[in-house]
Swiss-Prot record:
GO terms for molecular function: calcium channel activity; gap junction hemi-channel activity; structural molecule activity; wide pore channel activity. GO terms for biological process: cell-cell signaling; monoatomic cation transport; osteoblast differentiation; positive regulation of interleukin-1 production. Glycans are attached at N71. The gene is PANX3. This is Pannexin-3. It comes from Homo sapiens.
């Protein structure tokens, strides 16, 4: 065996990817990076603001401070604070004998409304986890495995071709067999391509993804409506008039009709309201961007894997409308690019292919590795001319 053939075999052996068996791909990302950010912000920010509201309530004691009459004892003043906080009604005299009441319940419901908002924003995440993640996980495991295996099969094919070339004494026989194999598509492995083509006709994943982001937009709009309708109405009201002349106290003459109270937690209420509006206003463009990514193909990822035999979705113009499961899978393949060991090898081969296309007819990794192994990717011209001379 010559030194060149030995070097070619070593080079091809090094190009083979390690066989990953057993518990593998444990770090598979089943959420896109931007979706994960949206989830943490949309769910985490209400919980953070809720903890801020509770912390203020625990640190300052009573959330309101009522100006009770001077003849009230400490226990009576505490009763006034408790009664006014329980009712949280603002009494306003519109005219003689006309008493108009306005509820200030958003102040009391602030922590619980934030908890409800966090749970509401977590519903799309649960939908994705239970409706899409199981199928997506199996799809990614199969496709990643097949992409790496297809690359390895291509390298092993070149190794086999090199051995045949070494054993063949007649170069005509080798090149005739090689051309026959190419014409009959022996070098192609259509299982993966057909599976991806089937995913173009499937829409379960993309429907779940669209529903997830649409629900986020709907819940965000509902949050705006809630804040605008309920919080804005009491946003600047720091003081209110409270009436405790109810029940047994309704006939007590020494009890004033209205007692002025001040909301000590108004600043926290305002901070929470403004923060919620700002946070979800920032999230809306991110959610819309996530949806727009479904309107275009990740052609760079596809172009790299065009180096594999039978993976010609781009060259054969098999890509149609991008709103299907295949596009969602491609987005997650891009997010899990670290699991695709073959991607780095094929990216290098794509760069090298661009520098040699003027000299050689290189279409796949088989052609390029054949060239690197010291074999011509196509029949040499002197053999072609000799064959033409023999068969004029």
């Amino acid at each position: 065996m010559s030194l060149a053939h030995t070097a070619a075999e070593y080079m091809l052996s090094d190009a083979l990817l390690p066989d990953r068996r057993g518990p593998r791909l444990k770090g598979l990302r089943l959420e896109l990076p931007l979706d994960r950010i949206v989830k943490f912000v949309a769910v985490g920010s209400p919980l953070l603001l809720m903890s801020l509201a509770f912390a203020q309530e625990f640190s300052s004691g009573s959330p309101i401070s009522c100006f009770s009459p001077s003849n009230f004892s400490i226990r009576q003043a505490a009763y006034v604070d408790s009664s006014c906080w329980d009712s949280l009604l603002h009494h306003k005299q519109d005219g003689p004998g006309q008493d108009k009441m306005k509820s200030l319940w958003p102040h009391k419901a602030l922590p619980y409304s934030l908890l409800a908002l966090a749970l509401l924003m977590y519903l799309p995440v649960l939908l994705w986890q239970y409706a899409a993640v199981p199928a997506l996980s199996s799809d990614l495991l199969f496709i990643i495995s097949e992409l790496d295996k297809s690359y390895n099969r291509s390298i092993r094919l070149v190794q086999h071709m090199l051995k045949i070339r070494q054993k063949s004494s007649d170069p005509y026989v080798f090149w005739n067999e090689l051309e026959k194999a190419r014409k009959e598509r022996y070098f192609e492995f259509p299982l993966l391509e057909r599976y991806l083509a089937c995913k173009q006709r499937s829409h379960s994943l993309v429907a779940t993804y669209l529903l997830r982001n649409s629900l986020l937009l709907i819940f965000t709009s509902a949050t705006y409506l809630y804040l605008g309708h309920f919080h804005l109405d009491v946003f600047f009201q720091e003081e209110f008039s409270c009436s405790i002349k109810t029940g047994l106290l309704s006939d007590e003459t020494h009890v004033p009709n209205l007692i002025t109270c001040r909301l000590t937690s108004l600043s926290i209420f305002q901070i929470v309201s403004l923060s919620s509006v700002a946070i979800y206003t920032i999230l809306v463009p991110v959610i819309i961007y996530n949806l727009t990514r479904l309107c275009r193909w990740d052609k760079r990822l596809l172009s790299v894997y065009e180096m594999l035999p039978a993976f010609d979705l781009l060259s054969r113009k098999m890509l149609g409308c991008p709103i299907n499961d295949l596009n969602v899978i491609l987005l997650f393949l891009r997010a899990n690019i670290s699991e695709l060991i073959s991607f780095s090898w094929l990216s290098v081969l794509c760069v090298l292919k661009d520098t040699t296309t003027q000299k050689h007819n290189i279409d796949t990794v088989v052609d390029f590795m054949t060239l690197l192994a010291g074999l011509e990717p196509s029949k040499p011209k002197h053999l072609t001319n000799s064959a033409c001379d023999e068969h004029p």
